[in-house]
Amino acid sequence: MLVLVTLIFSFSANIAYADSESDCTGSEPVDAFQAFSEGKEAYVLVRSTDPKARDCLKGEPAGEKQDNTLPVMMTFKNGTDWASTDWTFTLDGAKVTATLGNLTQNREVVYDSQSHHCHVDKVEKEVPDYEMWMLDAGGLEVEVECCRQKLEELASGRNQMYPHLKDC
C-alpha cells in the first residue's frame, strides 16, 4: 500500500511539475509595448542584479504612445525622500532605449509572462544586469513564479537586490 501511495504521489508531483513548466511559456514574440501592458499600467522593480538599483523604483506611463515612443515617469526613494524623473522609452520589438536628458540606457525584454503581469529585462552593459518587473497592482502567482525562475536562470548565481522591500 505504501508503495502504491508513493508511486501515485510521485506521478502526481511529476504531472504538477510538467504543468508548471508548460505554464512558463512566455509571450511570443516578446514585444516591449505588450510587456508594458500597452502603456496602461505601472510596474515595480522587484528584483535586480544591479547593486545600485533604486529603492522602490516604479515606472508608470506619463502619456500616450506616439509612434514608437512612450513617456514614462520613474518614481523612486532617494534616502527617505521620494523623487521622480520623466524618461522617454523608445520601443523596437523587445528592445527599449530609455532616455533622460543625455543619459541613455539600452535594455531588452527577454521574458514576458502570458498576461503581461511581470517581465524580465536584460540591461545592456559590459556585464549585463537582469531585472524583474511586476505590475504595481500585483500579478498571477504562477506567472510571477515563472518570472522569478527566468531571472534565476539568467542571473546564474549572481547576487540579487530586492529594491521594493525598502519601506515603500
Swiss-Prot record:
Localization per record: Secreted
Subunit-level organization: Interacts with complement C5.
Family affiliation: Belongs to the calycin family. Lipocalin subfamily.
InterPro entries: Calycin
Protein known as: Complement inhibitor
Positions contributing to (12R)-hydroxy-(9Z)-octadecenoate binding: R54, T85, R107, H119, D121
Cysteine pairings via disulfide bonds: C24-C146, C56-C168, C118-C147
Positions bound to (9Z)-hexadecenoate: R54, T85, W87
